[in-house]
């Protein structure tokens, strides 16, 4: 039996939904190697037929049915992708009918509602949150910190910046971050500029070995990246968090998505759009 399988994530818009749901399912099959391809903006029957022809050729080449995950609103476009030599997993067809029955209402079947700019006010809020996080990255801008929903604090390279941007983009959270420097860590006292915002602080920590590896790629053979320094910084940062009752989590074995979701839950933050 071949351990190689083609998988397509097809959508009439960005492809984010089909890709995310399909990828989640495929991660449960570790022994298989999936050749993944995302195909967005398949919004006409003509486009669907052309794509179906290409997928059919791949099925003949591989002697295996490709896996086709779709999140397409238009039933005619969906039908054009229904082939005998593919496994079609249609997220819309699988769930929308059950919801219509339960809710007693027909779905509007409007393309682009999940990831399109349907509501300008919500979209603007999302962009404002991203700009806020960019402007308040790495402690560069300390003004307006009172407008932050959360302030991530941690040693350098503990995952603060990508987490802030993900919180802004995915949840509309105004997330600032502040890097704990050696000067900050010399005392258990919180950095002076953060004292008024203690209730908004959330700490990120990381395993010293992992931190050493990350820093060594950036600045090899430096004191900054040395194992002793990484261990000291992490220990002092965690002591500071505990001393002041600042909640914190380890980012060592977590993805950005997991870190952000954990912060949303533990800090009792709500989605802003």
UniProtKB/Swiss-Prot annotation:
UniProt-listed Enzyme Commission number(s) = 2.7.11.33, 2.7.4.28
- The cysteines joined by S-S bonds are none
The record's listing under Pfam families reads:
Kinase-PPPase (PF03618)
Q: Which InterPro entries match?
A: Kinase-pyrophosphorylase, PSRP
The reactions it catalyses are: [pyruvate, water dikinase] + ADP = [pyruvate, water dikinase]-phosphate + AMP + H(+); [pyruvate, water dikinase]-phosphate + phosphate + H(+) = [pyruvate, water dikinase] + diphosphate
GO terms, molecular function: ADP binding; ATP binding; phosphotransferase activity, phosphate group as acceptor; protein serine/threonine kinase activity
UniProt keywords (A-Z) are:
Kinase, Nucleotide-binding, Serine/threonine-protein kinase, Transferase
The main enzyme category here is transferase
Q: Which domain of life is it from?
A: Bacteria
Q: Where does ADP bind?
A: 154-161
| Entry annotated with the keyword Nucleotide-binding | yes
**PANTHER family linked to this entry:** PYRUVATE, PHOSPHATE DIKINASE REGULATORY PROTEIN 1, CHLOROPLASTIC
Its biological purpose is as follows: Bifunctional serine/threonine kinase and phosphorylase involved in the regulation of the phosphoenolpyruvate synthase (PEPS) by catalyzing its phosphorylation/dephosphorylation.
Q: Which family does it belong to?
A: Belongs to the pyruvate, phosphate/water dikinase regulatory protein family. PSRP subfamily.
The name under which this protein is listed is: Putative phosphoenolpyruvate synthase regulatory protein
Which species is listed as the source? Chromobacterium violaceum (strain ATCC 12472 / DSM 30191 / JCM 1249 / CCUG 213 / NBRC 12614 / NCIMB 9131 / NCTC 9757 / MK)
